[in-house]
Every structure is written in structure tokens, then in C-alpha cells.
């Protein structure tokens, strides 16, 4: 879409906000259009979500729900981005690469579970982690050789603490892998991971746009990073695609995103946190994902060390199911927590 400015004096399509809006609606339309077709195809092929044997009893009714819906919204995101974003911008190219790599990892994992009708039959934990490490390394290596800012910032503080240089690659890999797995753990109830992901993308988009603008970044004491604002187009496309997906994923879900969706969303959130220099603030932006991950760590650690469980079941959303909360109540309350956390994160823009 940006190329249209080369053939006319009308600069309408040169504005990031305009192209982000087009990307949003294109991805939304593609997601809404192709998702029901995919659902019908997946039902015919019996590409259903295998249910964990220890999951709450209410989940057994979901055993016939198709999965791998992430393929559609990632496809919609990439198509909209290719049409609307500046493909000469290396932040955009690496962002698309990140989505493709992690969607592929998730797809392999999903297919293994579906073909064997076993929730444990996908990639082994070791193989999944190795695949995520390789994919993360590819992304951060390209970022580094392209000269990305390697300074380290803390939330609510206007100056960089230090320049980590090449050692920042280790932190960036950790951020992407952790974020990817955190969203994956959260994706256990209808729409639970989708809406907090949208909130996180919107918050990060604000940081991307402001840091990419010389005037705003200087006024707000944000890192000034040329070209970063172009990622808002890619982020807006994913928001639109996720909203289209949510139409079919809200309770009771007609389709699940699968690992192909959750792993790629999480990795992309981690990527946006890295390039916008919000590696630490990402803990607040993705607070619900962090909460879910911590609950699993506490549960596993406590059981291995003390042979006792902290929660009735982990991740923590299953704990609330076990104590009698209905699914919709858990989902909406977690959405509220995610919204509040992102509001606080956005306040940090001014409080520096």
C-alpha cells in the first residue's frame, strides 16, 4: 500500500496510522471470512483438540472442538502486513519471521497431538524448547546485526541503566521463549488468552509509535528508535485478526487457536517488548500470562520439593474451576486484570 505514494502526490498512505487502520480491517475481514471455512474443514477432518485427562470435567465437552485456528489469524496478519506495511523496514520483516517460525513450531506440535489423539503426543518438552531457542536466536541475531539498540531500560525511569551489547542476546532469547510459553499456558479457557493478547498488543503499539517518533520520544523520555513505528502496522493487523478469531473463540468456543496460535502470539509479544526496550515492563503488560506461568512454576516446584500442591490444579485458571467458579466468570475477571495491568503500564509512559 505504501508504494501508492510513489505514483501520486497524495500522501494519505504514507501515514502509519492510516496503514495500521487498513491492516486492522483487512486482517479482521480475512479472519472472519476464512475462520468458519476452516472450522468446517477441521470438523470434517476431525482435527479436534485432545483434552488433558486431568482437566476439569466440564472440558470433556470440548473434545470435538477444532483446533489450529491460529493458522488462520496468523495467515490474515501476514497478508494484511504484506499489503500495508513498509517491507523495506527490517523490524517488520523480522516480526513476520518471528510469527512464521513460532507458528510452524506450534503447527508441528498440534499435528502430533491431533494425529495420535493424545495431548502428550506433540513435540517433547525438550524438542519444543530447542525449537523455540533456535527460532528465538535467529530473530535476535538478525536484530543484533542490523544494529538494534542494546541499552537496558527499567519502567518508570527515563535513562538507560547500561548498554549490554552482545550479552543482551541472552536476555532477548529468554524474553521471547518465556513470553511464547506463557501465552501457551494461558490458552486453556475460551477466549482467555485472546483478549489479554489484544490488550498487550495495543499497549505495546503505543510504545512502538511513540519511540518511533522523534518529537514524542524526546518529550516523553522514551528511547528514540528510527523506523520502529512501522511495527504498529503489523501489530494492528494481528489485533484485527485476533478480533476476527475471538468471534468464534468466545464462550462456548467453536475453535481453539492451538499451539500454532498461542506460541506465535507470545513470541511476537516478546519481540515487540525487545525492540521497544520494554523487556521488563512486559511483565506488567502481560501480567495475566505471568500470573499463569508463576502458578505452574510454584505448583511443580512445590510438588517436587515438598510433595505438596499449592493449587488444586495449575495453571491457576484451572484452580478456580476446581473451586467452583464458572468458566465465564474466570475469563471475564482475568480480562479485567489484564486491562488494569495494561492501564498501569501505559501510565509509565508519562511517569518517568
Swiss-Prot record:
Keyword Repeat: no
GO terms for MF: metal ion binding; phospho-N-acetylmuramoyl-pentapeptide-transferase activity; UDP-N-acetylmuramoyl-L-alanyl-D-glutamyl-meso-2,6-diaminopimelyl-D-alanyl-D-alanine:undecaprenyl-phosphate transferase activity
Subcellular location: Cell inner membrane
Positions of transmembrane segments: 10-30, 67-87, 88-108, 129-149, 159-179, 191-211, 227-247, 255-275, 280-300, 329-349
Catalytic activity: UDP-N-acetyl-alpha-D-muramoyl-L-alanyl-gamma-D-glutamyl-meso-2,6-diaminopimeloyl-D-alanyl-D-alanine + di-trans,octa-cis-undecaprenyl phosphate = di-trans,octa-cis-undecaprenyl diphospho-N-acetyl-alpha-D-muramoyl-L-alanyl-D-glutamyl-meso-2,6-diaminopimeloyl-D-alanyl-D-alanine + UMP
Superkingdom of source: Bacteria
Keywords in alphabetical order: Cell cycle, Cell division, Cell inner membrane, Cell membrane, Cell shape, Cell wall biogenesis/degradation, Magnesium, Membrane, Metal-binding, Peptidoglycan synthesis, Transferase, Transmembrane, Transmembrane helix
Gene Ontology CC, one term: plasma membrane
Alphabetical list of Pfam families matching this protein: Glycos_transf_4
Pathway, per record: Cell wall biogenesis; peptidoglycan biosynthesis
Topology of the protein relative to the lipid bilayer: Multi-pass membrane protein
InterPro entries per UniProt: Glycosyl_transferase_4, PNAcMuramoyl-5peptid_Trfase, PNAcMuramoyl-5peptid_Trfase_CS
Major site of localization recorded for this protein: membrane
EC assignment: 2.7.8.13
Enzyme's top EC category: transferase
Cofactor: Mg(2+)
GO process annotations (BP): cell division; cell wall organization; peptidoglycan biosynthetic process; regulation of cell shape
Function: Catalyzes the initial step of the lipid cycle reactions in the biosynthesis of the cell wall peptidoglycan: transfers peptidoglycan precursor phospho-MurNAc-pentapeptide from UDP-MurNAc-pentapeptide onto the lipid carrier undecaprenyl phosphate, yielding undecaprenyl-pyrophosphoryl-MurNAc-pentapeptide, known as lipid I.
NCBIfam families: mraY (TIGR00445)
Similarity annotation: Belongs to the glycosyltransferase 4 family. MraY subfamily.
Protein name, as recorded: Phospho-N-acetylmuramoyl-pentapeptide-transferase
Annotated source species: Campylobacter lari (strain RM2100 / D67 / ATCC BAA-1060)
Biological classification of the source: Bacteria, Pseudomonadati, Campylobacterota, Epsilonproteobacteria, Campylobacterales
Gene, per the UniProt record: mraY
Amino acid at each position: 500500500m505504501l508504494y501508492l505514494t510513489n505514483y501520486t502526490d497524495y500522501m494519505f498512505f504514507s501515514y502509519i496510522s492510516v496503514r495500521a487502520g487498513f491492516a486492522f480491517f483487512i486482517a479482521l475481514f480475512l479472519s472472519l471470512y476464512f475462520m468458519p471455512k476452516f472450522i468446517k474443514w477441521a470438523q470434517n477432518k476431525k482435527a479436534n483438540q485432545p483434552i488433558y485427562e486431568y482437566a476439569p470435567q466440564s472440558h470433556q465437552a470440548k473434545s470435538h472442538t477444532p483446533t489450529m485456528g491460529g493458522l488462520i489469524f496468523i495467515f490474515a496478519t501476514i497478508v494484511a502486513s504484506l499489503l500495508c506495511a513498509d517491507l523495506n523496514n527490517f523490524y517488520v520483516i523480522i516480526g513476520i519471521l518471528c510469527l512464521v517460525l513460532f507458528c510452524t513450531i506450534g503447527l508441528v506440535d498440534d499435528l502430533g497431538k491431533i494425529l495420535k489423539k493424545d495431548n502428550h503426543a506433540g513435540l517433547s518438552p525438550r524438542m519444543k524448547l530447542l525449537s523455540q531457542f533456535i527460532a528465538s536466536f535467529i530473530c535476535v541475531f538478525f536484530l543484533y546485526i542490523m544494529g538494534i539498540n542494546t541499552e537496558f531500560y527499567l519502567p518508570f525511569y527515563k535513562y538507560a541503566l547500561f548498554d549490554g551489547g552482545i550479552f543482551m542476546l541472552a536476555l532477548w532469547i529468554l524474553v521471547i521463549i518465556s513470553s511464547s510459553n506463557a501465552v501457551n499456558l494461558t490458552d486453556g479457557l475460551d477466549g482467555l488468552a485472546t483478549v489479554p493478547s489484544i490488550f498487550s498488543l495495543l499497549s505495546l503499539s503505543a510504545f512502538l509509535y511513540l519511540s518511533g517518533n522523534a518529537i514524542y520520544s524526546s518529550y516523553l523520555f522514551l528511547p528514540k528508535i528510527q523506523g520502529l513505528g512501522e511495527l504498529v502496522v503489523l501489530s494492528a493487523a494481528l489485533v484485527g485478526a485476533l478480533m476476527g478469531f475471538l468471534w468464534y473463540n468466545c464462550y462456548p468456543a467453536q475453535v481453539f487457536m492451538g499451539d500454532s496460535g498461542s506460541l506465535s502470539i507470545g513470541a511476537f509479544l516478546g519481540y515487540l517488548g525487545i525492540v521497544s526496550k520494554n523487556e521488563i515492563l512486559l511483565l506488567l503488560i502481560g501480567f495475566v500470562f505471568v500470573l499463569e506461568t508463576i502458578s505452574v512454576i510454584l505448583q511443580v516446584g512445590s510438588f517436587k520439593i515438598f510433595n505438596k500442591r499449592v493449587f488444586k490444579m495449575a495453571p491457576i485458571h484451572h484452580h478456580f474451576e476446581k473451586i467452583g467458579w464458572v468458566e465465564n466468570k474466570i475469563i471475564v475477571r482475568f480480562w479485567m486484570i489484564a486491562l488494569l495491568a495494561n492501564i498501569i503500564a501505559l501510565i509509565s509512559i508519562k511517569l518517568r
